Regions:
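Short, charge- and proline-biased low-complexity linear segments
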Residues: 156-172, 216-225
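Contiguous segments within soluble domain cores/interaction surfaces
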Residues: 27-145, 161-187
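Bacterial N-terminal signal peptides that target proteins for export
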Residues: 2-13
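Short tyrosine-centred short linear motifs in exposed loops/low-complexity segments
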Residues: 144, 152-156
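Bacterial N-terminal signal peptides
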Residues: 13-22
């Protein structure tokens, strides 16, 4: 992560800006985490090809300190993200009698995966080896944003094989698969706008949230927006990542 430190700190008047904020409430829906980052899949003759949209920064697994109900409760207490989306690129046909399969080959220990919801698999169902689930899923070609989570913050990655297989997932002879690796950035507290860089935009964004007593400026997570949060953010900003 690049660091571009501002040389001058912004002043504030604590007495005018101290404000209490309400504790986190029960959230209705989990957050995707940012702009969609597509994993494009297409057929080139007897081969499947994949390409990740690199115009969108690497996602960050984030803990929003929220509580979710129902099936989404599997994300409670985790750092999670759902920006990666499998999507078919162009127009092409699957070989007769075949389906598209996505299989996890390897990954950082502790990375959990849950279905984004398909015609056959309800949302938040464990997939890709999570909770003893199969390492592969069948994909119908519709845009699919699965949920990726971890109980500890950090950089994570997972490598997948996309291939043509029969109804049981056995690869079809004569067709080449595609291998693709998805990555998630290490969470950096000073990257306020979560664009993957630390610069003046982060400082300005935090200062604006602080002045508005926005809960997003509760840097230390104690339920209040006050000088302790400003000092904490300033220290993290100067330290970089």
């Amino acid at each position: 992560m690049k660091t571009n430190l501002r040389q001058s700190n912004q002043a504030f008047v604590a007495a005018a800006l101290v404000s209490a904020v309400a504790p986190a409430a029960l959230a209705v829906d989990p957050h995707m985490g940012g702009e969609m980052k597509h994993v494009m899949v297409w057929r080139d003759g007897a081969s499947l090809e994949t390409m990740i949209d690199e115009t969108v920064p690497l996602p960050i697994l984030t803990n929003y300190d929220e509580t979710y109900a129902g099936a989404a409760s599997v994300l409670n207490g985790t750092w999670y993200n759902s920006q990666y989306g499998w999507v078919v690129e162009g127009f092409w046909e699957v070989p007769p009698g075949a389906s598209i399969w996505i299989e996890r080959l390897s990954g950082t220990p502790g990375l959990l995966s849950y279905s984004g919801g398909t015609m056959t698999t309800p949302a938040f169902t464990p997939i890709f080896g999570t909770a003893g689930s199969p390492a592969r899923i069948i994909w119908d070609g519709r845009m699919l944003h699965n949920w990726y989570a971890a109980t500890e913050p950090g950089p994570y990655q997972a490598t997948y094989k996309v291939y043509f297989g029969d109804a049981g997932g056995t690869p079809l002879n004569g067709y080449m698969p595609s291998i693709v690796t998805l990555e998630w950035h290490l969470y950096c507290p000073a990257d306020f706008n979560r664009d993957g860089y630390i610069n003046g935009n982060d400082y300005d964004g935090f200062a604006s949230a602080f002045e508005a007593a926005d809960p997003a400026a509760d840097f230390n997570g104690d339920g209040y927006v006050n000088g302790n949060d400003y000092d904490g953010f300033a220290s993290a900003f100067e330290a970089g990542c």
